[in-house]
């Protein structure tokens, strides 16, 4: 991802990307760790919903679910570690973003795992009631 950020900085749009991304990255890097973690958990949950829905409905409905989940995480300002890697690589150095990025990775993973386990638990409960 940082390779892509480096390559984009070499293009005619690189200066504008850096100008636009700079304040966003500064806000993310100055946020508290708990805030980053909680926003990343929410994003992880949305990404789990998107993927799980598409697996169940690999058609236009699943595609719409993915589109909606991604739109919500962007509009809500949730933290997605992969998306942030690109922006961090544009305007910051690894020493400045390593810890926040690690927190986002943990938050994204936690959100997805929690929702996955909750879904499995509900399904097991339904199956045991029907048996």
Put a short name on every predicted segment.
Residues 1-131:
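Alpha-helical transmembrane segments and their helix-helix packing motifs
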């Amino acid at each position: 991802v940082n390779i892509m950020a480096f390559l984009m900085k070499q293009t005619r749009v690189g200066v504008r990307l850096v100008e636009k991304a700079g304040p966003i990255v500064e806000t993310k890097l100055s946020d508290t760790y708990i805030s980053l973690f909680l926003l990343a958990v929410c994003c992880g949950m949305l990404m789990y919903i998107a993927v799980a829905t598409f697996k169940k409905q690999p058609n236009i409905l699943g595609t719409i679910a993915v589109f909606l989940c991604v739109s919500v995480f962007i509009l809500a300002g949730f933290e997605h570690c992969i998306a942030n890697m690109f922006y961090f690589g544009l305007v910051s150095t690894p020493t400045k973003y390593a810890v926040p990025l690690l927190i986002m990775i943990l938050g994204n993973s936690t959100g997805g795992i929690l929702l996955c386990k909750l879904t499995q638990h509900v399904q097991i409960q339904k199956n045991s009631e029907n048996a």
